[in-house]
Regions:
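Ubiquitin-like/PB1-type beta-grasp interaction modules and other compact soluble beta-rich domains
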Residues: 1-127
Length: 127
């Protein structure tokens, strides 16, 4: 399954392949698999920039990611909880093969060639 981070206008910011696949996955399971993999990859390298869906504690926004104040392991479960909260608050939405996931419990058929787009929404200033 291919994961793409995109803007609301459709610009692709980052694309990577997700290792965890089952034939049917809920939106919650897709988010969980994505968060687990990106945190695992970051913790293995412990770089300066975390390229993840949600902002870790003690990090600041950087170009296409989050600048970490110090090299430390990120807790994937905490990131997963924050991502689910962000989804429910409409902080982002996801498209599975061009179909929008409406709830965390909605289930989709998943194939190797399935593309999932995560689209982060930017709140309007003053609105």
């Amino acid at each position: 399954m291919t994961i793409t981070d995109a803007t609301p206008s459709g610009e692709k910011l980052r694309t990577f392949t997700l290792d965890s696949l089952t034939e049917r996955m809920s939106v919650r399971e897709i988010i969980r698999a994505r968060i687990w993999q990106e945190v695992r990859d970051y913790n293995a390298k412990c770089g300066e920039i975390f390229h993840g869906l949600v902002q870790p504690t003690d990090a600041e926004r950087a170009l296409n990611g989050w600048r970490m104040k110090e090299c430390r392991a990120i807790d994937w479960e905490q990131q997963f909880a924050r991502a689910c909260e962000a989804f429910e608050r409409n902080g982002f939405f996801l498209l599975v093969a061009d179909r929008q996931g409406e709830s965390l419990d909605e289930v989709f058929e998943i194939r190797v060639e399935t593309e999932v787009q995560f689209v982060k929404l930017t709140p309007l200033v003053g609105g």
